[in-house]
Amino acid sequence: YDCTLSFEGHINNSDVSYNLSKTNDILLSGFNLIGNPFAHDIYKGEGAAIDNDDLAEGYYILSNSGAWSAKISDGTAIKPCQSILVKTVKAGELKIKKTNSSPSRKSRDNESLEIKVSNSNYEDVAYVSFDNKVGLEKIEHKNVNVPMIYIPVEDKDFAIAMLEESTKDIPVSFEAKTMGEYTLSVSALNDRFDNIYLVDKLTGDFANMLLE
């Protein structure tokens, strides 16, 4: 099916502001859906169009498979007309600057881990960053068949968890939504880890994920 889309109006040539809401005392408060209002790519992160001030690290995009896929604030472009789901720590105005500059400080500058689970149809990912920023809480996928992997910390589940540098043990939770075989993989985003061991709490088996 081919079609031609036309947009009427004026191209934004200056900064654009959104009002972000946050309702206290409800589950997963502070999530807001915002879009790229410009005709060029933008980025989220320090020094980029969407700064991390008052926002949790990273954001979500809705994939074609119906998964809310977490993205860390790095060199991943937000395309024109693309929407992302961000979490704010307080209600207020968010200014999106008219710039296509990439973040001045990227996730790979820190010690970070990417933990991925996949089957033959879907995949999900969680991140661990040893930093003092605000983590991104895990949300349910639109597609109930997509598996979920997340990091539980202090009674909350995170897609992007922020932990102390001294942390040695990281809890990882996984939910298989359908029967089948799943693959779990771990990647060090900056190659600063010599060994990363996955311990099966049920069997006691462990494996060095950097060698598997």
Predicted feature locations:
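Compositionally biased Ser/Thr/Gly- and acidic/asparagine-rich
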Residues: D2-E212
